[in-house]
């Protein structure tokens, strides 16, 4: 069964989350998977793991609680937000692979614009080297975890985060998703510790020299997600 893609444009965050929850609650085995592509007005969202100490100075930007995974992030105009509503049991993969597939779709999308996307162990999302966005050098390996000690902290040296990911799974079905920064006002990211990491730099495509309209970026991201989330 093919995924149904809907480009929604700019929509209210809370109304969109409610619509995702409603569809997930009522969907049956024959209902199609959906992919919603949209953007939101300026707001911060706190995930289930969110801590108030990571919201530094929100000012006039509202902070909303969300039932997605992860910590605090910012949404605003110029960001493509993709919400896959997938029956994971029917698709045949678990949450860990689902996250990997979303990240891979973003990486393949960036590659078509001449940008190399990277994963950072322990920190979901996609990162780029702002000073060398097209370079293919591998990131340093994460030191192994010693028995009885916490995992080493993620190493963001020389990196900027370009796509944030936070998902929710209910009744084996996913909602929420991934946000790709295209051409945004990035200043609000300085008012938080993005995704719970103090000092983590956030970038968008325009920062690294890629000029795209929102609809162009949304179309390609949607296409890659359809490919990589297929059963």
Swiss-Prot record:
- Give the matching PROSITE patterns: BPL_LPL_CATALYTIC (PS51733), LIPB (PS01313)
**Is Transferase one of the keywords?**
yes
A GO molecular-function annotation:
lipoyl(octanoyl) transferase activity
Something else the entry says is: In the reaction, the free carboxyl group of octanoic acid is attached via an amide linkage to the epsilon-amino group of a specific lysine residue of lipoyl domains of lipoate-dependent enzymes.
**Name of the featured protein:** Octanoyltransferase
The GO cellular component terms are: cytoplasm
Which residue numbers delimit the BPL/LPL catalytic domain? 29-231
Reactions performed catalytically? octanoyl-[ACP] + L-lysyl-[protein] = N(6)-octanoyl-L-lysyl-[protein] + holo-[ACP] + H(+)
Q: What is its EC number?
A: 2.3.1.181
Location comes to: Cytoplasm
- Keyword list, A-Z: Acyltransferase, Cytoplasm, Transferase
* Recorded metabolic or biological pathway in which this protein acts: Protein modification; protein lipoylation via endogenous pathway; protein N(6)-(lipoyl)lysine from octanoyl-[acyl-carrier-protein]: step 1/2
- Could you list the residue ranges that cross the membrane? none
Q: Name one GO biological process term.
A: protein modification process
Q: Which residues bind substrate?
A: 68-75, 164-166, 177-179
Q: Which Gene3D superfamilies match?
A: Bira Bifunctional Protein, Domain 2
Question: What is the role of the protein in this entry?
Answer: Catalyzes the transfer of endogenously produced octanoic acid from octanoyl-acyl-carrier-protein onto the lipoyl domains of lipoate-dependent enzymes. Lipoyl-ACP can also act as a substrate although octanoyl-ACP is likely to be the physiological substrate.
Query: Per its UniProt record, what InterPro entries does this chain match?
Result: aa-tRNA-synth_II/BPL/LPL (IPR045864), BPL_LPL_catalytic (IPR004143), Octanoyltransferase (IPR000544), Octanoyltransferase_CS (IPR020605)
What the entry lists under Pfam families is as follows:
LplA-B_cat
- The site (Lowers pKa of active site Cys) lies at 161
Active site feature: 195 (acyl-thioester intermediate)
């Amino acid at each position: 069964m093919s995924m149904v893609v809907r480009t929604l444009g700019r929509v209210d965050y809370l109304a969109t989350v409610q619509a995702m929850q409603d569809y997930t609650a009522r969907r049956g085995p024959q209902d199609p998977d959906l992919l919603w592509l949209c953007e939101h007005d300026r707001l911060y969202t706190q995930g289930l793991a969110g801590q108030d100490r990571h919201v530094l100075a929100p000012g006039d930007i509202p902070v909303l609680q969300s039932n997605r995974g992860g910590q605090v992030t910012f949404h605003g105009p110029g960001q493509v937000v993709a919400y896959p509503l997938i029956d994971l049991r029917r698709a045949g993969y678990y949450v860990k692979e689902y996250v990997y597939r979303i990240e891979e779709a973003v990486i393949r999308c960036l590659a078509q614009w001449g940008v190399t996307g990277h994963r950072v162990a322990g920190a979901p999302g996609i990162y780029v080297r702002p000073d060398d966005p097209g370079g293919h050098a591998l990131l340093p390996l994460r030191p192994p975890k010693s028995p009885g000690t916490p995992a080493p902290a993620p190493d963001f040296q020389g990196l900027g985060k370009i796509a944030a990911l936070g998902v929710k799974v209910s009744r084996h079905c996913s909602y929420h998703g991934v946000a790709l920064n295209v051409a945004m006002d990035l200043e609000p990211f300085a008012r938080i510790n993005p995704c719970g990491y103090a000092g983590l730099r956030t970038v968008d495509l325009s920062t690294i020299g890629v000029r795209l309209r929102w609809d162009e970026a949304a179309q390609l991201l949607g296409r890659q997600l359809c490919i990589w989330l297929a059963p």
